[in-house]
Amino acid sequence: PASPQKRAASPRRSPKKSPRKSPKKSPRKRSASP
């Protein structure tokens, strides 16, 4: 069970599949732009 648990953490940490964690797509920078 320790093997599949490490795999699930691999794609979760990946900022490529997680655009919400990506600071590039963050709407915070768009809000500063008038």
UniProtKB/Swiss-Prot annotation:
Residues 9-34 have a biased composition (Basic residues). Residues 1-34 are annotated as: Disordered. Keywords: Chromosome, DNA-binding, Nucleus. It is found in: Nucleus; Chromosome. Sperm. GO terms for cellular component: chromosome; nucleus. Its main location: nucleus. The keyword DNA-binding applies. It comes from the Eukaryota. The keyword Hydrolase does not apply. One of its GO terms (molecular function) is DNA binding. Histones H1 are necessary for the condensation of nucleosome chains into higher-order structures. Belongs to the histone H1/H5 family. This is Histone H1, sperm. It comes from Strongylocentrotus purpuratus (Purple sea urchin).
